[in-house]
UniProtKB/Swiss-Prot annotation:
InterPro entries: DH_E1 (IPR001017), PDH_E1_Alpha_Subunit (IPR050642), THDP-binding (IPR029061). Induction: Strongly induced by acetoin. Transcriptionally up-regulated by AcoR and sigma-L factor. Subject to catabolite repression by glucose, in a CcpA-independent manner. This is Acetoin:2,6-dichlorophenolindophenol oxidoreductase subunit alpha. It comes from Bacillus subtilis (strain 168). It is an enzyme of class 1 (oxidoreductase). Tetramer of 2 alpha and 2 beta subunits. Keywords: Acetoin catabolism, Oxidoreductase, Thiamine pyrophosphate. The keyword NADP does not apply. The lineage of its organism: Bacteria, Bacillati, Bacillota, Bacilli, Bacillales. One of its GO terms (molecular function) is pyruvate dehydrogenase (acetyl-transferring) activity. GO terms for biological process: acetoin catabolic process; pyruvate decarboxylation to acetyl-CoA. Disulfide bonds: none annotated.
């Protein structure tokens, strides 16, 4: 088993290639959704995760199906990193009956309980208490499972942020809070809306570790997540990780992004692209043909997901009032 190393961090070649594949799946999926939305094919709103791939993948690389995550309105990347089916995800965004939520959730409410994906959430800050509830279940059942709460920088000013972190600390819950600080709460720069220079600084108020990492460097995210997740899994309690990142697209599709400068977009989209940076690292550590094979497979899987969705039926009218209430036969998390 070949180990790839960098500054004290080691991971297997197999894991590194899995991470590369997941990053490409997220980017390919989001770029395709961007294209389809512009064509007027997709119903509803979409908020794209492209550019932030290193965060979701670097964290979820340490999770298994028994672990759970909560997500945001920008949740496609978290779903893919957690192992959700690409066909089912694309069909859900198309509003088709073969979607993960039978076409009823759409982009902002994709969930897959079998994969521990408790749901994307249209409510800003809606995932904090859900993650705590899942973590409480894991602690009560002594499963050693952990819960991860992904949230954006805009959510760190919501009351549920403080309620969730406080409760997690008081009850010593196995939960990791992951802040995706992409610099803007919709169009408002982070520094205009926060009295703290860093979201991670707020961890001190709740007596938990807090760290800020480069969210464009997947190995930095991977290393920080490994420590926090193992701490939670072994009874050490909650942690807060702030990942400094950048979204390639607007807050939503149709956002003109007039609040961003041309120079910053060039810097992040061309000079600091997370996928290209990880690929440059892998080219020094593994066979380039392996990367090419992954790129080809991912491209084919995205096109397959689109074809599957286009060929799938819409939900029947008789389905309108079904699934109004939760009925999860496996007994929940």
């Amino acid at each position: 088993m070949k180990l790839l190393k960098r500054e004290g961090l080691s991971l297997t070649e197999e894991k590194a290639l899995w991470m590369y594949q997941k990053m490409l799946e997220i980017r390919g999926f989001e770029d395709k959704v961007h294209e389809l939305f512009a064509q007027g094919v997709l119903p509803g709103f979409v908020h794209l995760y492209a550019g932030e791939e290193a965060v979701a993948v670097g964290v979820c690389a340490h999770l298994h199906d028994g672990d759970s995550i909560t997500s945001t309105h920008r949740g496609h990347g978290h779903c893919i990193a957690k192992g959700c089916d690409l066909d089912g995800m694309m069909a859900e965004i198309f509003g088709k009956a073969t979607g993960l939520c039978k076409g009823k959730g759409g982009s902002m409410h994709i969930a897959d309980l079998d994969k521990g994906m408790l749901g994307a959430n249209g409510i800003v800050g809606g995932g904090f208490t859900l993650a705590c509830g899942s973590a409480l279940t894991a602690k009560y059942k002594q499963t050693k499972n952990v819960s991860v709460c992904f949230f954006g920088d805009g959510a760190n000013n919501q009351g549920t942020f403080h309620e969730g972190l406080n409760l997690a600390a008081v009850w010593n819950l196995p939960v990791v809070f992951v802040a995706e600080n992409n610099g803007y709460g919709e169009a408002t720069p982070f520094e205009y809306a926060s009295a703290c220079d860093s979201i991670a600084d707020r961890a001190a108020a709740y007596n938990m570790p807090g760290v800020t990492v480069d969210g464009k460097d997947i190995l930095a995210v991977y290393q920080a997540a490994e420590e926090a997740i193992e701490r939670a899994r072994n009874g050490g309690g909650p942690s807060l990780i702030e990942c400094m990142t950048y979204r390639n697209y607007g807050h939503f599709e149709g956002d003109a992004q007039t609040y961003k400068t041309k120079d910053e977009r060039v810097e992040h989209l061309e000079e600091k692209d997370a996928i290209q940076g990880f690929k440059n690292y892998l080219l020094k550590e593994t066979d380039a043909n392996k990367l090419s094979d992954i790129e080809q497979r991912v491209s084919e899987s995205i096109e397959k997901a689109v074809s599957f969705s286009e060929d799938s039926p819409y939900p029947k009218d008789s389905e309108l009032l079904t699934d109004v209430y939760v009925s999860y036969e496996k007994g929940g998390m």
